[in-house]
Amino acid sequence: VTPDNDMLILDCYHGRLQVPEQEKMIDLYWNKWDCSFQAIEDKQSGIGIIQKKKNEGRPILELKAKGDKIERATASILFYANMKVYHLKGAEWLGNLETQLLEFPNGKHDDVVDTVSYAGMVIENKNSIVSGV
């Protein structure tokens, strides 16, 4: 997030991982990007990972799915409409990200869109979220 609240998408992973690999990926991104917090959806495998990372002292924002996927995407749709989202030019994952975004909500896959949707919600509510972490 820039000081002007623009969304920067600097990295993107898409794939199915078992829980141990999910934790490794979460740790990898934590260390790679020197995050102030991490956001994890609080359902399925995320519940246990949230508990473990919190017990390790990591600041975790628990994401709760509310409404349908289109409703959750509203904040990010507005970021895109206002040209406040930037993708890393030339990134190997960029084609997959853009395909999922362009096919949403009727595409075969929308996992990456879900992540972008949550990012938009987090940025939109940044002040209240950061103080609550």
Predicted regions and their residues:
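Intrinsically disordered or highly flexible coil/loop and linker segments, enriched in small
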Residues: K32-C35, V85, D110, N125-I129
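Short coil/turn segments at secondary-structure boundaries
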Residues: L88-E92, V112-S117, S131-G132
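Low-complexity, compositionally biased segments
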Residues: H14, S45, V113-S117, S128
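Acidic two-metal-ion nuclease catalytic site recognized across multiple nuclease folds
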Residues: A119-V133
